[in-house]
């Protein structure tokens, strides 16, 4: 688990387990290791990123989607757009590292279906909803605002295309 908010001397300000940041970190670190192509770093860090993905799968993957976070041990079951996008890539990445672990590929496919069913706003020309309740009901938030843009979902699409092309 990563810490996410700090004071000026790097003390954690809040007891927050950010599931989205952890799954995002798992694949971004692996991508960085791929680019660096340094076996020493890969040997040290690849097992850690695998553990992160496994922990997120076990702790936060519920009903074909990833919960938002846990503050002081209490889960926020909201499903946030960027977390679902990062989860698709993170679980594909975990499957690519361990092709025998079909649960990760199945989870990535299930999260994609969840996104299509609940997060994609069906109105023509629209975007993904910011977030939905655990039951898939959209929560009223702007479709686009300073913290909500197609960065994560766009990157997810590009990563999935790249990774599936590499796999074939």
Give names to the regions the model predicted.
Residues 1-168:
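Glycan-recognition and catalytic cores of secretory/periplasmic carbohydrate-active enzymes
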